[in-house]
């Protein structure tokens, strides 16, 4: 609340799960960054106090995650956790960094990509500024060990045009041109033109190309769960 969504009522805290609208200006800024991951953390102590039922809040939370994932694209992982507890000592209640630490570790486990805490940026609306209800987001960033921006400052920033690289879908390797120069640090329009040229020059279905953000890395193959052995089932009809 206040960072990715706002209340329609204009109140600091929503009157119900229906009292929300997406902050598309924040969505747009996040998309320009092309981050490897967007990890959403939210204190929801109202659940423990009985103000909102978890069965009502969870679909709202999932909806916001799904909206951002759909908008920002599949090259960025969007995930989230919320803390329903009010105990200030609970490791997952902001300003404690437990939720961020859990999700960053899970991201590394699932993708094989390691992101250092100092390379992360936290964006929030509880920055301790005049008129704000708290500084819990700012303190969370400090406790986690990453940089911080208030959401208003973030949306007002002039961000540079994102850059891309062209890769082979078969192995994720960056494609090189005829002069052996890697096709990277391209604008989106330049990358699109390069992909179109490569697809026309290589019509074979096994040669497919696309462009991805410069920060994109090839994720590792997910661990294969053990498969049960096939069993032959003999159906013995019951004798009459």
Spell out what each predicted region is.
Residues 1-39:
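Active-site neighborhood of HAD-like aspartate-dependent phosphohydrolases
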Residues 16-22, 52-60, 94-95, 132-136:
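Alpha-helix N-cap and loop-to-helix initiation/capping positions
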Residues 26-61, 76-89, 123-126:
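Substrate-recognition element of Asp-dependent hydrolases with the DxDx(T/V) motif
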Residues 92-135:
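Conserved Lys-Pro-Asp/Glu-containing loop-to-beta segment of HAD-superfamily phosphomonoesterases
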Residues 121-160:
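Acidic, Mg2+-coordinating phosphoryl-transfer loop and its flanking beta/alpha structural elements
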Residues 192-239:
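Short, mixed-charge low-complexity intrinsically disordered segments
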């Amino acid at each position: 609340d206040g960072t990715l969504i706002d209340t329609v009522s204009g109140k600091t805290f929503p009157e119900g799960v229906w009292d929300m609208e997406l902050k598309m200006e924040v969505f747009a800024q996040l998309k320009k960054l092309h981050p490897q991951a967007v990890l959403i953390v939210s204190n929801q102590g109202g659940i423990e106090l009985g103000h909102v039922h978890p069965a009502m809040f969870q679909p709202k939370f999932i909806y916001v995650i799904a909206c951002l994932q759909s908008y920002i694209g599949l090259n960025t992982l969007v995930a989230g956790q919320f803390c329903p507890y009010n105990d200030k000592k609970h490791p997952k209640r902001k300003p404690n960094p437990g939720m961020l630490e859990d999700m960053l570790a899970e991201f590394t486990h699932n993708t094989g990509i390691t992101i250092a805490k100092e390379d992360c940026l936290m964006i929030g609306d509880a920055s301790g500024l005049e008129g704000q209800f708290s500084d819990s987001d700012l303190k969370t960033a400090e406790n986690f060990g990453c940089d911080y921006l208030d959401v208003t400052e973030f949306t007002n920033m002039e961000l540079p045009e994102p850059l891309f690289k062209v890769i082979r879908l078969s192995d994720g390797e960056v494609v090189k041109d005829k002069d052996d120069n890697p096709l990277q640090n391209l604008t989106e329009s330049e990358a699109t033109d390069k992909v179109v040229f490569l697809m026309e020059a290589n019509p074979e279905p096994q040669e497919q190309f696309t462009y991805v953000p410069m920060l994109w890395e090839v994720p590792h193959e997910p661990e294969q769960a053990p498969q049960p052995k096939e069993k032959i089932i003999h159906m013995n009809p019951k004798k009459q």
